[in-house]
């Protein structure tokens, strides 16, 4: 049987790695990789690369510092969306609950298709502007 490369994690560019990592940590219930935890109060945070793992220690997302990050204008095409993340929830009620959680954590609503009978979903943008979808599966 042939071996294939395995996906380690998805890396998101950001001008604020800690802020974006914290957003996804809280949204998805992840934890920091050992050594990537926030510094003690009063200690500068100079992190330029952070990794989040699940409860089993499997890497899920990484955050890489960049100097600039033009925010996507999707659905307009001036600054295209080059990647987006899809997250599923179990019911329409959970879809609305998770949208509210995401917005409370700093996400912005981009598109509301929650009334779509075939595939209810929300498209939101994280604090760095990366689009992500919440939909019922």
Language-model region placement:
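Core segments of cupin and vicinal oxygen chelate
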Residues: 2-4, 13-61, 104, 112-115
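Structural preference for beta-strand elements that scaffold enzyme active sites
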Residues: 9, 60-62, 84
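Short, solvent-exposed beta-alpha or beta-beta edge segments that form flexible loop/patches at the rim
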Residues: 61-71
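Short, flexible turn/loop "capping" segments at secondary-structure junctions
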Residues: 1-4, 77-79
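Vicinal oxygen chelate
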Residues: 17-18, 56, 70, 78-128
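Short loop/turn microsegments at loop-to-beta-strand junctions
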Residues: 8, 48, 119-121
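Short beta->alpha transition motifs characteristic of CBS
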Residues: 134-137
């Amino acid at each position: 049987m042939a071996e294939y490369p395995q996906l380690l994690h998805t890396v998101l560019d950001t001008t604020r790695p800690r802020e974006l990592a914290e957003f996804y940590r809280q949204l998805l219930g992840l934890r920091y990789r050992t050594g990537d935890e926030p510094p003690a109060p009063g200690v500068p945070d100079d992190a330029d690369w952070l990794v989040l793992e699940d409860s089993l220690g499997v890497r899920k997302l990484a955050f890489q510092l960049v100097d600039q990050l033009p925010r996507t204008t999707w659905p307009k095409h001036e600054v295209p969306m080059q990647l987006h993340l899809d997250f599923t929830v179990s019911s329409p009620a959970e879809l609305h609950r998770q949208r509210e959680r995401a917005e409370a954590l700093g996400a912005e609503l981009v598109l509301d298709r929650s009334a779509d009978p075939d595939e209810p979903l929300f498209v939101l943008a994280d604090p760095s502007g990366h689009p992500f979808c919440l939909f019922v599966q």
